Curated annotation (Swiss-Prot):
Residues recorded with modification Valine amide: 17
Family named by the database record: Belongs to the MCD family. Bombolitin subfamily.
The protein's name in its UniProt record: Bombolitin-4
InterPro entries reported for this sequence: Bombolitin (IPR012534)
One GO term describing the cellular component: extracellular region
Keyword field contains Oxidoreductase: no
Organism phylogeny: Eukaryota, Metazoa, Ecdysozoa, Arthropoda, Hexapoda
């Protein structure tokens, strides 16, 4: 798992909110 993947996921979740 890459850090970028995690950050991208967090950004996606936060962006969804």
């Amino acid at each position: 798992i890459n850090i970028k993947d995690i950050l991208a996921k967090l950004v996606k979740v936060l962006g969804h909110v």
